[in-house]
Design a protein with these regions (language model features):
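Extracellular attachment/recognition segments
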Residues: 1-84
């Protein structure tokens, strides 16, 4: 397994954003997860959903929707793990 950060983002309070990343080999098993980089205690800060587009026979595009669950702006990293 290997991991990385694909992008960094910021969402205003209670906002939702959508990002995409393309050209991922269709044979890879990729897991996406978001990590807030703005500390805040007491409750979850973000939630996300992942949708997949089979762009061609060999590649995928991932569409990631991220929702800020707080009233404050949140900075975060869009991270991935490629499972072996």
């Amino acid at each position: 397994m290997w991991t990385g950060t694909q992008w960094t983002g910021t969402l205003a309070g209670n906002a939702t954003g959508r990002w995409f990343t393309f050209g991922w080999p269709a044979t890879w098993h990729v897991t996406w997860y978001m990590m807030p980089t703005s500390p805040q205690i007491g409750a979850p800060q973000i939630d996300w959903e992942v949708a997949v587009e089979r762009a061609d026979p060999n590649a995928c595009t991932y569409w990631i929707t991220v929702r800020n669950l707080t009233a404050n702006a949140v900075n975060f990293e869009g991270r991935y793990a490629v499972l072996s």
